[in-house]
Amino acid sequence: MSIEIRNITKSFGSFQALKGIDLTIGSGELVALLGPSGCGKTTLLRIIAGLEAADSGQILLHGEDTTHRHVRERRVGFVFQHYALFRHMSVFENIAFGLRVRPRGQRPPEAEIRRRVQELLELVQLDWLADRHPGQLSGGQRQRIALARALAVEPKVLLLDEPFGALDAKVRKDLRRWLRRLHDGLHITSVFVTHDQEEALEVADRVVVLNAGQIEQVGSADEVYDHPATPFVCQFIGDVNLFHGRVHGGRALIGETVIELPDIAESDTEKALFFARPHEIEIGRGTGIGAVVRAIRRRGNAVRVELERKDGRGAVEAELSREAFGRHAIKHGDEVVIQPSKIRMFQP
């Protein structure tokens, strides 16, 4: 089922949570709403579900206007960050709940409910926990049960609000990969909210980056990471270094340093913002931006080097492989020069 969001606005008092959101999500697509706290991503998800009313605009599900339809009429499954499982019910009863509370004319026979619940328990690989209660489960197991409960009513759209936010890092990583595999098998249109860039880039078909109630960019993981549309996207997704400078003759001028811009067809400008990721910063002793090594931090197979520019214009972070770090023989307090091997340019 496709989702079409047309010029959705929403305010809470004087605060504008959403400012004219337009977005189309294809049938069977898995889309991440990514952004910082307060950007409007959860509000948008709740409006799609029918849990929140928009001030203006339309929500179309499979071409039908559902803007004013009750949540029960939208055939939407919702998974909350904190599971929202019924503690007094067993796992089996939690999953069956949505089917058993349907009006009598829409309620499946009990045998069909039991068959459906058993299928879902096997789907989420927790059939051996059917008689347990939520308090006896781990966080990861609870979230799988919450997902099974959402799927029990056979929704046309699955919405997930920070589904892994309450879990530790290792469980989060395992569960998001499991969710991707599950989605590939079910092909149900899914939208999930997250503030975790790595999570969005790894799981989603497309990422919608929101900021201050507006969409900054929509694209694949590669598009938003390698080709950010705005300075906000560039700074929000992944680590990045910011340099202030200007453009002249197809070159970036950062202080006294000149960097060729072969991929940027920009006219001369007196003010420009240049961004380079830590792994795009080269460290040497020739020409470049003078800097002093202030800290060295080893992170698995990589080494992060924190540097302070000698011209007083801020700090720079570089990332080297352990092999490259060993060749440079860098130590704390060394005076070096840095040179971005690749930069992205924006006009302020």
Curated annotation (Swiss-Prot):
Family, per entry: Belongs to the ABC transporter superfamily. Sulfate/tungstate importer (TC 3.A.1.6) family.
Listed name of the protein: Sulfate/thiosulfate import ATP-binding protein CysA
Keyword Protein biosynthesis applies: no
GO molecular-function term, one example from the UniProt record: ATP hydrolysis activity
Main localization of the protein described in the UniProt heading: membrane
Organism: Methylococcus capsulatus (strain ATCC 33009 / NCIMB 11132 / Bath)
Gene3D superfamilies: P-loop containing nucleotide triphosphate hydrolases
Alphabetical keyword list: ATP-binding, Cell inner membrane, Cell membrane, Membrane, Nucleotide-binding, Sulfate transport, Translocase, Transport
Record's bilayer topology term: Peripheral membrane protein
Enzymatic class: translocase
Binding site for ATP: G35, P36, S37, G38, C39, G40, K41, T42
